[in-house]
Each structure stands twice: as structure tokens, then as C-alpha cells.
A protein has these predicted regions:
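Non-globular targeting/processing and membrane-anchoring segments
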Residues: 1-110, 127-130, 137, 143-282
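Short loop/edge segments at beta-strand edges and connector loops
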Residues: 118-119, 140-142
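Catalytic nucleophile loop
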Residues: 108-125
Length: 282
């Protein structure tokens, strides 16, 4: 291979170079965490237009896309007439993005629903999903939702928050910003409430629990559309029973594994969500 490569060094020199880069990587990680904290303090934009979509079972509203959860992430997938590969295939870049999306049960466990939207009819969407092995809800656009939310000409990801029947747009990213998405953590960092873990710098009153303890194998989560409502003890017991039922094991879930803080349920978008309050844990 006639390509100019970096020099060959000893193990000690290699380790020293790696540690230098590690320090820079940690700086980037801390900057990323700080940016996500700012994102959680962005003002919200209320969505007051009644957008309609077509799902596999008929017409649905934007509120329906939440599937009862508090948060929604919507990716604009270009699959429609005029797109490369139509009707057999979807946009190559959007297809690559779909291949990268983590198992959605992990997002659901933090009260986040992930959905795709396209102009293609449902018959074509369901066929493509099956052929490509993609999971998750995928809806047909029927109005100007894509134009209103910046995804009529290019792919992009919008984040929303629900408070009762009111829906708010909380963030939007496209172009290279989309390239960083795919993992559970990347989508949670984009969401209005974040990872909901105690180390995060979030506005006071945001739901948070200990890191690691809520993590599960994707088939071991309790089916729960909102992890922040109900009794903590009840949720832990339900998680233990669910694991026993699905794995045949008698392992106990660690304290705080499947729910939020024992102080009670979070009742909606907290006061001060967009005021720059920095009282959350660092």
C-alpha cells in the first residue's frame, strides 16, 4: 500500500500518544455534555397546527405518534417518487441511517418514541420495512408537516415533548448533525429530558435516576409507556417479575432499576425548563 502512514513506534511511545488523545477526547465529551445541557434549556415552540399522518391502521395525529409517551423523535426518511431507487428502494443515505438506529426498547424505557415519516404510501412503507428488517413506527406524510419542520427537501430529525394534549417542538438537527445519531445515547441527548440520569446538568425538577441501574437487555424491559409515573417499588417488583418470566431466571433487579426517583411522578414540563436554571446535578 503506497500511502504515507504515521511512523512506527514502541509500545511505550504509542501509549503516550494515545493518552494525549484521550485527554482531548475527554474535553470533547465534557463539551458534548455541556451542549446537551444547553439543549435541555432551550425554549419550546408549541405546535398548534393539526397535522395528520397515515399509519398502517389509518389516519393518526401528531399526538398519536407519541404512542402515549412524553417524548417523540421524528426522522424524515426520503422514500417517495423522485427519490433514487423508488419504488423498490429508499434514499441510500436515509437507508444507512435506518440501519444504525439502536433497538427502540431502550428509548421507550426512557419515555421516548422514535418514528419515521415519508411521502410513500403505507403499502410501500410496510413492504420496505419487511425487506430491510427495520423496526419501529413509520408514517405517511399527508400535509405540510415536512415543510413546516424543515424536512421537505432534506433529511432531518425533530424532537418533541408532550404535556397532556399539548405538543412542543424542542429541537431539530439535519445534515451532518444527523450523522452523529443512531445510538440510544445520541437520541436521548437530543431529547428534551436527556438521559434522565443523576449526573446530568438538567433544570430543577427534571426526572432523573441513577445511571446503569435502569439498563436492561432489550427484551427485559417492562412494557411501560411512561417510566416516571407510579410507585417506584411497584416498578422494581414488576421489572423483577418480567425478567423472571422472560428469562426463567430469579435474578433481582437492582434498586432503582426501572423507574425514576422515589419522590414521585413527574407531572409535565417543569417550571423553569427554558429559563437557564443550572441547579441540576453536574
Amino acid at each position: 500500500m503506497n500511502v504515507p502512514l504515521p511512523p512506527i513506534v514502541s509500545a511505550q511511545e504509542w501509549e503516550a500518544a494515545r493518552l494525549q488523545l484521550r485527554d482531548k477526547e475527554k474535553e470533547v465529551t465534557r463539551a458534548h455534555d455541556a451542549l446537551a445541557a444547553e439543549r435541555r434549556r432551550m425554549p419550546r415552540m408549541e405546535v398548534d397546527k393539526a397535522y395528520r399522518f397515515e399509519g398502517p391502521d389509518g389516519p393518526v395525529s401528531l399526538l398519536d405518534l407519541f404512542e402515549g409517551r412524553r417524548q417523540l423523535i421524528v426522522y424524515r426518511f426520503f422514500y417517495e417518487p423522485g427519490v433514487s431507487g423508488w419504488p423498490e428502494r429508499g434514499c441510500p443515505g436515509c437507508s444507512m441511517m435506518a440501519d444504525q438506529v439502536a433497538h427502540l426498547s431502550h428509548l421507550n424505557a426512557r419515555g421516548v418514541t422514535y418514528a419515521r415519516v415519508s411521502r410513500a404510501p403505507q403499502e410501500s412503507i410496510q413492504r420496505l420495512k419487511s425487506e430491510m428488517g427495520w423496526d419501529g413506527p413509520w408514517y405517511t406524510l399527508t400535509d405540510d408537516f415536512d415543510a413546516d419542520f424543515g424536512v421537505d427537501e432534506w433529511h432531518g430529525t425533530n424532537a418533541f415533548l408532550r404535556n397532556g394534549d399539548r405538543v412542543f417542538r424542542t429541537y431539530f438537527v439535519n445534515h451532518r448533525g444527523d450523522e452523529a445519531l443512531g445510538s440510544t445515547w445520541s437520541y436521548l441527548d437530543l431529547s428534551a429530558l436527556g438521559r434522565q440520569e443523576e449526573w446530568e446538568d438538567s433544570p430543577e425538577g427534571y426526572p432523573q435516576s441513577k445511571p446503569y441501574q435502569w439498563w436492561r437487555r432489550h427484551d427485559e424491559y417492562v412494557a411501560d409507556i411512561d417510566p416516571w409515573e407510579g410507585s417506584l417499588d411497584e416498578k422494581i417488583a414488576a421489572a423483577q417479575e418480567h425478567v423472571r418470566a422472560t428469562t426463567g431466571a430469579s435474578t433481582e433487579a437492582p434498586t432503582g432499576a426501572s423507574a425514576g426517583p422515589s419522590t414521585g411522578a413527574w407531572s409535565g414540563a417543569p417550571t423553569g425548563a427554558s429559563t437557564g436554571d443550572t441547579s441540576g446535578a453536574a
